Each structure stands twice: as C-alpha cells, then as structure tokens.
Regions:
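N-terminal loops that bind phosphate or other acidic moieties
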Residues: 1-245
C-alpha cells in the first residue's frame, strides 16, 4: 500500500486516539516516576478532542483540513506548551492548502518531518534530552529512509525506531521539565512524551497491517512514585538541590 485515502487516514487517527486513551495508566505511571504524573490525563483530554473532530468530519474529503482541524482541537483542549507540541506531532504540523484526497508515503514522511522541525523550533529539544524527541526523531528518520517502500514497511520501521528511542530515553538526564531537577536520578526512567510518541507510531503501524500488538503493561515501568516524591521535597537555596525534610 503506497497511498491512503481520506477515510483510511481518518480511521487511522481514530485508532491512535483509542490507543492513547486505553493506555492512560501506562502513561500516567511513566510520568509519575519523574514528572508531574499528569501526562496520561492530558493526552486523554487531547485525544477526546481529536475524536470529536474525526467523527464530525466523517464525510469530508480533504486530508489536509482533517489534520489541521484535529490539531487545532487538540491544542485548544490540552492548552499550554504540551498541547501545542503534541498537537503538532499528532497532526504533522498540518497546513491547509490544496485539497488532498489521498496521501502518499512521501506526503506522510514530509508532514511528519515538518512536524518534528516545528517541535524542535518550539521547544529546542534534541535527541538525548529525555523528551518526546527521543522517539520522534528516529521515527522520522526511519520514515525518510523507507519512504520508497509501502506504508506497511515504512510505518513498521518508524514504530520500531520510536520504541528504541523511547527505551534509549531511560539512559538520559532530563534537560527539560520537572524531571531535570532530578538530574542523574532520572536515569533508568523512560520519558512519558516519548512513550506517547511510540504508542502513536505503533498504532499507525498496527492499523495499516490490520494487526494488534499487545498494550504495554504499566507495571513494566517499575516504581512510579520514586521520582515524583524526590521532586516534591522542599527545595531551598539552589533550586537544583532537593532537600529531604
């Protein structure tokens, strides 16, 4: 399969919203380990907003408009930087233009590459900073490397790369967000944003192949409270020094 129709794209995005909502406990546990613990909830809010648009535009015929409307709804519902970043990733930095009734592998790869560029411009994150970029960057590179192949092969490669990037995030010290206050203590924990990014790419690959890979087990993340408890301790003098009460 080298192109997707409007309806296939719409159904694929709907499947992604379902995957994220179903895995809220997994994402919450990942974020609770070293962050605020609200990533899963925020993603579900965004995905519910996306679903409303995707269901409302069932009779549409412009893929570009579908992406754009979905991104706007997610950003409005989620709010803040996270809303802007994840709506940009989910919709590939959609821009309305000439109506698009079919999407080729080249179109999809270019859209996601532009989304990555916009996210990095917005947040200045690089691979290795323990953010969603750890999964998104290698996924986009895989899309570009396999763009001449079928959607099945291209998305399989992207999902694998996103997973490996998410796993690699465990090795990094966080450069952004609340987790950066943990410094080396964040090592060993995966980034929640990278986890969401992997789930989205995995669901797209599953949808195109007509298969279902198992959802990850929240318990596989390990002790979820350790990082959050460390960050919640009183901080005095040096804002990077966590002082136990």
């Amino acid at each position: 399969m080298n192109s997707l129709t409007y309806e296939q794209v719409r159904e694929m995005l709907l499947a992604c919203t379902e995957r994220i909502m179903r895995n809220e406990p997994y994402l919450t546990r990942a974020d609770a380990a070293i962050g605020d613990g609200d990533h899963g909830t925020g993603m579900v809010i965004g995905m519910k907003a996306a679903r409303e648009v995707l269901e409302k535009e069932a009779d549409g015929d412009d893929i570009g408009k579908l992406y754009s409307d979905t991104a706007k709804a997610m950003e409005t519902a989620m709010g803040g930087a996270s809303g802007m970043i994840f709506s940009t990733m989910f919709a590939g930095n959609a821009k309305e233009g000439a109506p698009m009734q079919e999407m080729s592998t080249e179109d999809f790869a270019a859209r996601m590459a532009e989304g990555l560029r916009a996210i990095q411009e917005l947040g200045h994150a690089q691979p290795g900073d323990k953010t969603m970029v750890d999964a998104l960057y290698p996924a986009v590179e895989a899309l570009k490397s396999h763009v001449s192949e079928s959607f099945e092969e291209m998305l399989d490669a992207a999902a694998k790369a996103a997973y490996e990037g998410m796993e690699a995030s465990k090795k990094y010290v966080a450069k952004f967000g609340r987790a950066k206050n943990l410094m080396e203590r964040a090592i060993g924990h995966q980034d929640a944003g990278a986890s969401s990014t992997w789930l989205i790419f995995q669901e797209m690959a599953d949808f195109i192949r007509g298969e279902k890979t198992p959802d990850p087990d929240p318990e596989s993340i390990g002790e979820a409270k350790r990082g959050a408890e460390l960050v919640s301790k009183k901080i005095i003098n040096d804002p990077l020094e966590v002082v136990k009460e």
